[in-house]
């Protein structure tokens, strides 16, 4: 049984491993397969299967390694084979571009199709949700209508790639997208990006003068409105900085192509500066629980010490290049957002939310569900934190319930013939 006191932090995979009493079943075998993406990268596909399944799922995050994650254990208990592709850039924000990450997804889906599965699902958890929504959006387009460039202008070969649409999509604690997640969390009181200690007192979310308290903040509606507008402006400034970097690089490369370039031009053409983005854990909803109330506890995915999460070396979007910022972490420029991509979904979709999630709040989950373009969509609310752990000590473990609901939904949505093993596995469990 998971212990709600064991982990106070849920960012990344903290607290997300499968439960000791609910591992992958003994008759499910693990094999590892090299998967070659269309653009030539090689990723690893960790594949859990009994061997007689007709339905398989891809479970992936754009930068996390999910092999010990709880969802594969629960899905295999429901008779669903699972492919867990490792992203090409594990734990790396510096080069993460979602337009390339969806080629990793494509390689995993193609692998499952070659294996002969009749139905293929995408099961997107947390940041895997918007990643899969983005993949699906592009996969459903005619190849010539797919994106040809990243937000930074880099060419991407989506038109030539095999991008097989899934038969169904499941979202579990999916958020709005990494860019929107960060835009809701950036501290807009930062005055100078080169000085992480700089601050505008009138926008400081951790000032008692503005309503903060370590035991629970109370922010005035007027402050909240100014704060949110200033968050967008900070992201816009960071976008401008990133685009200036890209423009200098592009101009230098143009001079090289035209001939007569100087040594300085060649250095400028190769220069890819890495810049920190400080103070990215300041979503007011994490500290004032009266704003869009839910079952969440005080604090963010990173815990309840904002000094550590905002000024420590680890945090969302902490180190970026212009390319990764614009593609992944910008709430204004990233293509991988639920708002942009969910309307394209036409397949059956199951949307599962945890009521104590500190990354996605009731207004967010309602918006995501409303954006889903399919008319065949179902929603389930489960008491749990971001990674499906009990909110309070002594509460039941919600993870088996989530796995069971996914199994039931798959059995309802797909044929009896395809899902005979699903029902047998579910009943045996």
PLM feature spans:
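Primarily recognizes the serine-hydrolase "nucleophile elbow" in alpha/beta-hydrolase
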Residues: 119-194
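Short beta-strand/loop motif that positions the catalytic acidic residue
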Residues: 345, 351-353
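Alpha/beta-hydrolase
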Residues: 202-340
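N-terminal cap/lid segment of alpha/beta-hydrolase-fold proteins
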Residues: 2-53, 391-392, 396-399
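Conserved alpha/beta-hydrolase
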Residues: 72-93
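Conserved alpha/beta-hydrolase "acid-adjacent" motif
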Residues: 181, 358-364
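Catalytic active-site module of serine/aspartate enzymes centered on a nucleophile-bearing elbow/loop
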Residues: 383-429
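Catalytic nucleophile-loop/oxyanion-hole region of alpha/beta-hydrolase
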Residues: 88-121, 395-400
């Amino acid at each position: 049984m998971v212990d709600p006191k064991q982990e106070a932090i849920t960012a990344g995979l903290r607290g997300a491993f499968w439960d000791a009493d609910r591992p992958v079943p003994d008759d499910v075998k693990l094999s590892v397969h090299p998967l070659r993406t269309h653009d030539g990268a090689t990723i690893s596909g960790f594949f859990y299967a009994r061997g007689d399944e007709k339905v398989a799922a891809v479970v992936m995050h754009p930068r996390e390694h999910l092999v010990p994650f709880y969802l594969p254990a629960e899905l295999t208990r429901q008779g669903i084979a699972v492919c867990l592709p490792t992203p090409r850039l594990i734990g790396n924000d510096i080069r993460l571009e979602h337009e390339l990450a969806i080629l990793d997804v494509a390689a995993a889906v193609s692998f499952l199709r070659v294996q002969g599965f009749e139905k293929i699902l995408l099961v997107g958890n947390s940041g895997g949700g918007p990643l899969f929504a983005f993949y699906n959006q592009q996969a459903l387009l005619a190849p010539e209508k797919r994106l040809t460039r990243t937000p930074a202008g880099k060419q991407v070969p989506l038109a030539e790639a095999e991008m097989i649409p899934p038969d169904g999509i499941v979202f579990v604690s999916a958020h709005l997208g990494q860019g929107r997640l960060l835009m809701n969390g950036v501290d807009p009181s930062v005055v100078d990006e080169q000085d992480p200690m700089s601050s505008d007192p009138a926008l400081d979310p951790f000032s008692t003068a503005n309503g903060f308290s370590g035991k629970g903040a109370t922010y005035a509606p007027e402050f909240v409105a100014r704060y949110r507008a200033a968050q967008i402006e900070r992201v816009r400034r960071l976008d401008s900085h990133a685009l200036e970097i890209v423009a200098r690089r592009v101009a230098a490369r143009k001079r090289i192509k035209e001939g007569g370039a100087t040594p300085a031009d060649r250095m400028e053409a190769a220069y890819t500066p890495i810049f920190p983005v400080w103070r990215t854990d300041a979503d007011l909803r994490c500290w004032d629980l009266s704003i869009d109330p839910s079952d969440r506890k005080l604090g963010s995915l990173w815990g309840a010490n904002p000094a550590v999460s905002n000024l420590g070396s680890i945090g969302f979007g902490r180190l970026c290049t212009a390319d990764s910022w614009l593609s992944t972490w910008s709430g204004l420029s990233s293509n991988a957002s639920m708002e942009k991509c969910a309307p394209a979904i036409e397949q059956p979709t199951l949307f599962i939310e945890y009521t104590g999630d500190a990354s996605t709040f009731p207004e967010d989950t309602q918006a995501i569900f409303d954006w889903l373009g399919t008319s065949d969509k179902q929603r389930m609310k489960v008491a749990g934190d971001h990674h499906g752990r009990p909110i309070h000590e002594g509460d039941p473990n919600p993870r088996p319930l989530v796995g069971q609901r996914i199994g039931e939904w798959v059995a309802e949505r797909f044929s009896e013939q395809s899902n005979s093993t699903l029902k047998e596995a579910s009943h045996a469990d």
